[in-house]
From Swiss-Prot:
Protein name according to UniProt: LINE-1 retrotransposable element ORF1 protein
Region named C-terminal domain (CTD): 278-339
Region (RNA recognition motif (RRM) domain): 179-274
Comment field on protein domains: The coiled coil domain mediates homotrimerization.
Places the protein is found: Nucleus, Nucleolus; Cytoplasm; Cytoplasm, Cytoplasmic ribonucleoprotein granule; Cytoplasm, Stress granule
Miscellaneous comment in the UniProt entry for this protein: An active LINE-1 encodes for 2 proteins translated from a single RNA containing two non-overlapping ORFs, ORF1 and ORF2. ORF1p is described in that entry as a representative of all ORF1p potentially expressed by active elements in mouse genome. ORF2p is described in the related entry AC P11369.
Annotated region (Disordered), positions in chain: 1-40
């Protein structure tokens, strides 16, 4: 067919199929199988163009979502910085007011002493001195009220800062939800395999060949973090793999837990979820406790963002922080003894290592 004279696929269907408005396909006859090879070339081209347009729209929507989320995160960070500056300025004002109050009190004390001296000498109190004392007392009262108001404002700003920090943490964790963090891969492997993406594919082939057969390993982004290589850093930088969705990431993490030990070229490595720095710090605080509980078959699990879940005597308990966990230990002497002995053993080894430094 000549270029520019392509028939409309819709008109073609109207010419050759009276019931084209129905969506039910005609069952293929034995002699003419209904395959994509027998479709009209123009219809195939039209369908492929539609698929490409859908892909482009999807990627554009995803990019727009990431850009809007990044802008929102930047705005929250700027608001947090402004709040921190206000808190610092108010703290400075409080210090200045407190210094002024101390000066006034000192002046008042000196004036009182002067009045007492004059009273002893003359037996009378000068009216101007009484007015001065009254003025000082009023200034002190006003300064104390100002300090109280500023203290209230500082507390409110501190609370607002904490809420903003938590919101930023949630946004960062949401953006990182499809991510995987790979720990223990030497930097030189990037040059040998031409990038972290190929390293990840190599890990999947080596440890989880069935997963690669069952689902496509589509990687949106792969990079080392932090971006700049620090020559003084002893360990290699972590690799971040951004998958197409969180379901693929969760399936890989489940396979990692079931396998127990993941390797790369025979060497052990670690694959973990990717969280914000604040969330990672909170989760690391449970490391020693989880290791001890796992050794005593207490089935510990770390829930998002940093909650400890344990199963004892068939009952599952969840602790949001170490304070709650410590309170529970006071009601469970056996578990408290296990945790205490482990801590004492670790502290003893640390004390033995001190003279070697």
């Amino acid at each position: 067919m000549a270029k520019g004279k392509r028939k409309n696929p819709t008109n073609r269907n109207q010419d050759h199929s009276p019931s084209s408005e129905r969506s039910t396909p005609t069952p293929p006859s034995p002699g003419h199988p209904n395959t994509t090879e027998n479709l009209d070339p123009d219809l195939k081209t039209f369908l492929m163009m539609m698929i490409e347009d859908i892909k482009k729209d999807f990627h554009k929507s995803l990019k727009d979502l990431q850009e809007s989320t990044a802008k929102e995160l930047q705005a929250l960070k700027e608001k947090q910085e402004n709040t921190a500056k206000q808190v610092m300025e108010m703290n400075k004002t409080i210090l200045e007011l407190k210094g002024e109050v101390d000066t006034i009190k000192k002046t008042q004390s000196e004036a009182t002493l002067e009045i007492e001296t004059l009273g002893k000498r003359s037996g009378t109190i000068d009216a101007s001195i009484s007015n001065r004392i009254q003025e000082m007392e009023e200034r002190i009262s006003g300064a104390e009220d100002s300090i109280e108001n500023i203290d209230t404002t500082v507390k409110e700003n501190t609370k607002c800062k904490r809420i903003l920090t938590q919101n930023i943490q949630v946004i960062q964790d949401t953006m990182r939800r499809p991510n995987l963090r790979i720990i223990g891969i030497d930097e030189n492997e990037d040059f040998q395999l031409k990038g972290p993406a190929n390293i990840f594919n190599k890990i999947i082939e080596e440890n989880f060949p069935n997963i690669k057969k069952e689902m496509p390993m589509i990687i949106q982004e792969a990079y080392r973090t932090p971006n700049r290589l620090d020559q003084k850093r002893n360990s290699s930088r972590h690799i971040i793999i951004r998958t197409t969705n969180a379901l693929n990431k969760d399936r890989i993490l489940k396979a990692v837990r079931e396998k127990g030990q993941v390797t790369y070229k025979g060497r052990p490595i670690r694959i973990t979820p990717d969280f914000s720095p604040e969330t990672m710090k909170a989760r690391r605080a449970w490391t020693d406790v989880i290791q001890t509980l796992r050794e005593h078959k207490c089935q510990p699990r770390l829930l998002y963002p940093a909650k400890l879940s344990i199963t004892i005597d068939g009952e599952t308990k969840v602790f949001h922080d170490k304070t709650k966990f410590t309170q529970y230990l006071s009601t469970n002497p056996a578990l408290q003894r296990i945790i205490t002995e482990k801590k004492q053993y670790k502290d003893g080894n640390h004390a033995l290592e001190q003279p070697r430094k």
